[in-house]
Structure formats: C-alpha cells, structure tokens
Design a protein with these regions (language model features):
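Active-site groove signature of glycoside hydrolases
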Residues: 112-141, 162-173
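Active-site beta-loop-alpha junctions enriched in small/polar residues
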Residues: 10-14, 50-55, 84-87, 131-133, ...
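N-terminal pre-domain/capping segments
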Residues: 1-122, 142-146, 150-160, 192-196, ...
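Active-site glycine- and acidic-residue-rich loops that bind
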Residues: 58-59, 172-185, 203-214, 220-235
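Residue-level marker for buried hydrophobic side chains located in beta-strands
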Residues: 166, 197-198
C-alpha cells in the first residue's frame, strides 16, 4: 500500500508581497489556526513548511525553536521543509556575500535539527535559491553558474553535517535557475547527493513558457492553453528533465 505524501501548508505567503504598502502581514499564530482548521473532503494538513523569516521567526533568538515546537504541537501539526533566509547574501556575489549565504544555510540547518530534537520535525528539506538576479547572472552565464554551484557545494557540505538536504526552488526570478535547462545544468555542476530540486508548480509551468529564457521555451507562443494535451506534453518535458533531482514539492 502506498503512503500518501505529507500535506503541508506554507507560512511564507503570510509575508511575501505584504507590508506597509500592500496587504497586511498575516500573523504566524493566525496561519497556524487556519492551517489546523482547514479541511476538504475529510483531508486535513499534516503540518506546515516554515519560512525562517522575520517577523514570523527570529532565527537568532535562542528559544525560538522551542516556542515554534510548542505552537505547532498545540495544533497537532508537524514542521516539514524550511526556507533559509539566504538573501542577506548571494550565491554568486562577493566572498563576504557568499559566506553570508552559507552561514544562513548553517543557521537554518541547526534550527531544523533543534526542531527534530523537540519531536516536531521528522522530514523535510531546507529550501534555497541563488539569491541573484537574472540580469546579473546573464553578464557571465557560465562563470556565474559555476560560482553558484561552488556556493551550493559549500552549503551542501555544511548541511550534510546536520543530516539535511538542500532543495533549490525552481523559480524563474533567480539567476542560473530561471529556466528548466539552466536548472538542470546547475544541479549537475553542483553534483552533491544532498542537493536537489523543489518544484513550485506555477513556476514549473512558467518554465514551459520560457519566461526569462525564451530560448528554452517549450510551448509555442500561440499555444492554446485550454488544450490539456499540449500542456501535459510540455510539462512532461520539464518533468522528465528534473524528476531525477526532485525531492520536494
């Protein structure tokens, strides 16, 4: 009998795109309450995936993991994947920026291990990206991809010491990861057993449309997006390429 994948709600939509000039931030406690209460056809969330981002999570506070564990346990939830706040650095930046990137991964892995010790995290990855723009990457595509891969390798070695896997999220906005082909190339360059791909399904679809990388477009410009067979064929091309690397959705 197959075991169904664990179904988790993400906390970072409560922060991303929100703030003083937009919609208000959704408080972490409110997100937990909504997650625990949600139910469709008898199916409920098993847990949450947590963005280690302020004001939801203060990564440098010593009691933060304990407070989080108490909150999720109260609602009968588990913690799964974690989003490392790597944007204070960059995987293809200066030496100091790359050092900051790796340090943020280390802190995230340590936090994840604390949650495991507290009994609320039994699975999940640590999510990363290149923390670099597409236009900056395009100034030296090969050189920058090699530098990103080197940073990912350093971060992977740190993560391995904590028993963690890193997953690069396939988003079109991150340099070196902005097309399905570049994503595969970067993963091959990185070549670490504990580094894989996290599929964001909307961005995976955008891969097929060649956003930020028209040369890697699969769907024709005039494709009928109501034609499910055309869509399925395009997604299959992307899926076939990235499936060997995919460790999180």
């Amino acid at each position: 009998m197959n075991t169904l994948p664990k179904l988790h709600n993400a906390t970072w939509p409560g922060l991303v795109g929100k703030g003083p000039d937009s919609e208000p931030v959704i408080a972490f406690d409110q997100l937990l309450e909504m997650t625990a209460a949600a139910e469709v056809g008898g199916v409920k969330f098993d847990g949450i995936d947590v963005g280690l981002l302020e004001p939801h999570i203060y990564l440098d506070q010593t009691e933060e993991a304990k407070k989080l564990a108490e909150k999720v346990s109260k609602h009968g939830l588990k913690v799964g994947s974690l989003v490392a706040p790597i944007w204070a650095g960059s995987a293809m930046g200066t030496a100091d920026q790359r050092k900051t990137f790796v340090e943020m991964v280390r802190k995230s892995c340590e936090f994840g291990q604390q949650l495991k010790a507290l009994g609320v995290r039994d699975y999940g990855i640590v999510r990363i990206d290149s923390a670099a723009g597409v236009s900056d990457w395009a100034k030296d595509p090969l050189g920058n991809s090699k530098l990103i891969a080197k940073t990912f390798q350093e971060a992977a070695d740190i993560a391995a010491g904590y028993g963690e896997k890193l997953a690069a999220e396939g988003e079109i906005c991150w340099g070196g990861m902005h097309s399905w082909k570049h994503m595969v190339e970067l993963l091959e360059m990185t070549d670490r057993k504990n580094v894989g791909f996290q599929a964001d399904m909307s961005h995976t679809f955008l891969y097929t449309m060649g956003y930020n990388a028209p040369e890697h477009r699969i769907l024709p410009v005039d494709a009928d997006l109501k034609d499910r067979e055309v869509i399925k064929a395009a997604i299959k091309t992307v899926s076939d390429a990235l499936r060997p690397w995919t460790i999180d959705f």
